Design a protein with these regions (language model features):
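Membrane-proximal helix-turn-helix segments that form the acceptor-binding/catalytic region
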Residues: 2-9, 22, 26-30, 37, ...
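A short, histidine- and acid-enriched strand-loop-helix "catalytic/donor-clamping" loop
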Residues: 10, 36-53, 72, 102, ...
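Short His-centered aromatic/hydrophobic patch
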Residues: 15-20, 39-40
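Donor nucleotide-sugar binding/catalytic pocket of nucleotide-sugar-dependent glycosyltransferases
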Residues: 44, 56, 60-105, 165-167
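Short acidic alpha-helix that forms the nucleotide-activated donor recognition element
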Residues: 65-68, 134, 150-151, 172-184, ...
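Acidic donor-binding loop of glycosyltransferase active sites
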Residues: 71, 180-199, 211-214
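Conserved donor-binding/catalytic core segment of Leloir-type glycosyltransferases
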Residues: 74, 106-133, 137-141
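Nucleotide-activated donor-binding/catalytic signature segment of Leloir-type glycosyltransferases, i.e.
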Residues: 143, 151-178, 185
Length: 214
């Protein structure tokens, strides 16, 4: 990334998450350009790093070195902004991931279903949600893809829930909105696997609200 930036023309670099910040920071410093740091999550508190203490220690040192040098920073939730302020005394502006508003169409719920939309990753409460379907008289649609999809598919088969849990795969935004609009309720559950998940404010939270579902 750093080499590409050095040989590119730009006025501002928008660095998304800590793994892009070192290259962006030093490229901006070398070329005298402006930097905006965009923290989509509390990077050093994600489960993938918490489970790898050596790797996490390296990122923590980079974070401690670079964040106090950032003068323009944004993040997705007030909780994450407050955590960074308390730890590094760096101010973050909050820009939430809210969808563009639109006029709700009348709902035609021919099939009653719950909907989970988003990444199929560890810590999203998907295993518990699937197990709960054994006792619920309703379908579960899962829209998205991710690291644990095959594991979830096997879990559904083990519980013999193939007729109640339907994997939709990745959908384009328009098609996904149709499913969200038709849902009885949206699933937005996260396991407390670290401060990043604890303070998260997922996109799906606002998508569900915008589509008028609980």
């Amino acid at each position: 990334i750093f080499c590409n930036l050095i040989f590119s023309s730009f006025d501002i670099i928008h660095a998304v998450d800590l793994d892009t910040l070192p290259a962006a920071y030093f490229a901006c410093k070398l070329k005298g350009k402006k930097l905006v740091y965009d923290s989509h999550e509390y990077f050093t508190e994600v489960p993938e790093l918490i489970e790898r203490p050596t790797k996490r220690a390296i990122w923590l040192k980079l974070e401690a070195y670079l964040l106090p040098k950032v003068s323009n920073a944004i993040t997705v939730s007030q909780g994450i902004a407050d955590a960074y302020k308390e730890k590094y005394n760096v101010g973050f502006e909050v820009i939430r991931n809210c969808p563009v508003s639109f006029e709700l169409a009348s709902k035609k719920n021919e099939v009653k279903y719950l909907l989970y939309q988003g990444a199929l990753n560890k810590g999203r409460g998907l295993e518990a949600t699937i197990e709960a379907m054994q006792d619920l008289p309703i379908l579960l649609y899962i829209a998205g893809n991710g690291d644990i999809k095959e594991e979830l598919v096997r879990h559904v088969a083990e519980l013999k829930l193939e007729d109640k849990v339907i994997f939709l795969g990745e959908l384009n935004p328009i098609k996904l909105r149709d499913y969200t609009l038709g849902a009885f309720a949206g699933i937005n559950v996260a396991d407390n696997l670290g401060l990043s998940y604890y303070l998260s404010l997922n996109n799906k939270f606002f998508d569900y609200i915008q589509c008028g579902i609980p």
